[in-house]
């Protein structure tokens, strides 16, 4: 529901990012980047008591990071894949498999954690807000522009060059940041709603159990 609200708000403010209904300037994604790199090619040894989280493709859903089945690694394993350490505000793009092309922003709680095998994009924050670009890619732009790139090989796959050449709307940073604030507020509302529903369900189950007892 709330992701649909974000999509609708994006289209209202900035137009259709596929057909560019507002006639904005368009530049390749690389013009907004400071760095783009691949994650590790060798899986680390996992440890459920490890100090660090290891974000895989399966942890990236609907433009967000999910904790479901999150694996962990030790400090020793983390040291072997230092290039995968996250500073926060990167965008992770799944590079192969069923979820190829799915994206997320590395939010504050995942700073100093580790990305898995996927593409890690660091934007120039002086001109680009990662929340804005993540939401842009999670409009119907995902199905119209990104997903078709991933099916050109036998197995779904996207590479760094394809990501760098994605066409992106040019939007003033202030407008990007205002929209990003709206997205964060929507995410917070969604979290609070899910928490309230969870508490309500727990209360209902407790009442039923007490009555049956």
Predicted regions and their residues:
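Non-catalytic DNA-recognition/assembly elements of restriction-modification systems
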Residues: 1-39, 165, 170-178, 184-210
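Low-complexity, Lys/Gly-biased intrinsically disordered segments
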Residues: 22-63, 77-81, 100
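Short, ligand-facing micro-motifs at secondary-structure edges
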Residues: 40, 61-72, 91-115, 131-135, ...
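A structural connector/turn signal
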Residues: 76, 80-81, 108, 153
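Short, well-ordered loop/turn sites that connect or cap secondary structure elements
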Residues: 86-87
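A short glycine-rich beta-alpha junction/loop motif
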Residues: 96, 111-119, 128-131, 150-177
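Short loop segments at secondary-structure junctions
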Residues: 109, 123-126, 140-141
């Amino acid at each position: 529901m709330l992701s649909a609200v974000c999509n609708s708000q994006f289209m209202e403010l900035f137009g259709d990012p596929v057909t560019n209904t507002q006639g904005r300037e368009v530049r390749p994604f690389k013009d907004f980047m400071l760095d783009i790199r691949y994650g590790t090619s060798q899986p680390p040894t996992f440890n459920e008591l490890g100090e660090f989280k290891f974000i895989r493709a399966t942890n990236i859903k609907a433009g967000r990071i999910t904790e479901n089945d999150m694996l962990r690694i030790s400090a020793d394993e983390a040291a072997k894949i230092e290039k995968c350490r996250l500073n926060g505000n990167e965008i992770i793009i799944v590079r192969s498999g069923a979820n190829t092309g799915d994206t997320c922003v590395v939010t504050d709680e995942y700073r100093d954690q580790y990305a898995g095998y996927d593409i890690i994009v660091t934007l120039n924050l002086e001109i680009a807000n990662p929340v804005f670009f993540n939401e842009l890619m999670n409009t119907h732009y995902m199905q119209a522009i990104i997903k078709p790139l991933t099916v050109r090989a036998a197995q779904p796959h996207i590479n760094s060059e394809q990501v760098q050449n994605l066409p992106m709307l040019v939007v003033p940073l202030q407008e990007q940041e205002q929209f990003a604030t709206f997205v964060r507020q929507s995410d917070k509302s969604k979290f609070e709603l899910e928490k309230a529903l969870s508490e309500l369900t727990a209360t209902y189950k407790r009442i039923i159990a007490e009555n049956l007892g």
